[in-house]
Amino acid sequence: MIEKIWSGESPLWRLLLPLSWLYGLVSGAIRLCYKLKLKRAWRAPVPVVVVGNLTAGGNGKTPVVVWLVEQLQQRGIRVGVVSRGYGGKAESYPLLLSADTTTAQAGDEPVLIYQRTGAPVAVSPVRSDAVKAILAQHPDVQIIVTDDGLQHYRLARDVEIVVIDGVRRFGNGWWLPAGSMRERAGRLKSVDAVIVNGGVPRSGEIPMHLLPGQAVNLRTGTRCDVAQLEHVVAIAGIGHPPRFFATLKMCGVQPEKCVPLADHQSLNHADVSALVSAGQTLVMTEKDAVKCRAFAEENWWYLPVDAQLSGDEPAKLLAQLTSLASGH
């Protein structure tokens, strides 16, 4: 229902307009206060790159963060990552991730990013505290990438990157809750790069698509072509589950059942195993896998995806960030 409201298919969005006006007024006032320096943002001693979005829901932001970190690492840049840690609750903040950190403590995305990249990752509701924690333990870090946080103006930033779902884009264009917007589309004029996940990019936007890899067994790490798996049950606890199910079908998989889960939903063995009958194979997102690895069965697999950016602009963006980081 919420997707239909946000897309404008359902007329119910009009009933929510008063709340959206209030949301827009408050969020606009907050940004204006920082712009006019009525409130002061904290500036890190190293460059900060924000990878965020204008809308609620999944846009492919985390794969972009992973791509960015890996690309900078390949260029010899030491990168740290900070996040709010949605879906997790640590005993105290800031929390610097380690090999023992769970998704219950740090949230899904930070654990995924840490496991994929090996970069220092810290979470805190106050992102400046997360930055300080990384720099205290890793003083050689040259640049910070923040996963989400475009609207977290308490942390000053040097580069802003926005990721857009190229198919859904901005729906009916209204602020939450009548629409999906955290900020209006005009905010794109002030950011440094716009990356469009799927769909047809517009002038000045960087095209991106998510390239699926081989399926990975959660228990053994064995890899195979996902199309070789039989009697598949697919689950996805991400911002936009239909995207994952569509990816599976694009890979030649016809799931016997698709189960969308809430983003950041906590998972346990009993609930997940109940979704699969004897003889079936469970396939999930990598984000779900970081929550299930500790109690996975032999027939549980995940499908990793990598961001693939096209055109000349990604190289220019990376050159800009490398230059920024090298100056510190």
UniProtKB/Swiss-Prot annotation:
GO cellular-component term (any): plasma membrane
Entries under InterPro entries matching the protein: LpxK, P-loop_NTPase
Enzyme class of the recorded protein, top EC level: transferase
EC code: 2.7.1.130
Pfam family, one: LpxK
Catalytic activity: a lipid A disaccharide + ATP = a lipid IVA + ADP + H(+)
GO MF entries: ATP binding; tetraacyldisaccharide 4'-kinase activity
Annotated binding of ATP, by residue: 55-62
Alphabetical UniProt keywords: ATP-binding, Kinase, Lipid A biosynthesis, Lipid biosynthesis, Lipid metabolism, Nucleotide-binding, Transferase
Transcription regulation in keyword set: no
Pathway note: Glycolipid biosynthesis; lipid IV(A) biosynthesis; lipid IV(A) from (3R)-3-hydroxytetradecanoyl-[acyl-carrier-protein] and UDP-N-acetyl-alpha-D-glucosamine: step 6/6
GO BP annotation list: lipid A biosynthetic process; lipopolysaccharide core region biosynthetic process
Keyword Metal-binding: no
HAMAP family in alphabetical order: LpxK
Known function: Transfers the gamma-phosphate of ATP to the 4'-position of a tetraacyldisaccharide 1-phosphate intermediate (termed DS-1-P) to form tetraacyldisaccharide 1,4'-bis-phosphate (lipid IVA).
Family: Belongs to the LpxK family.
Protein's name in the database: Tetraacyldisaccharide 4'-kinase
Gene: lpxK
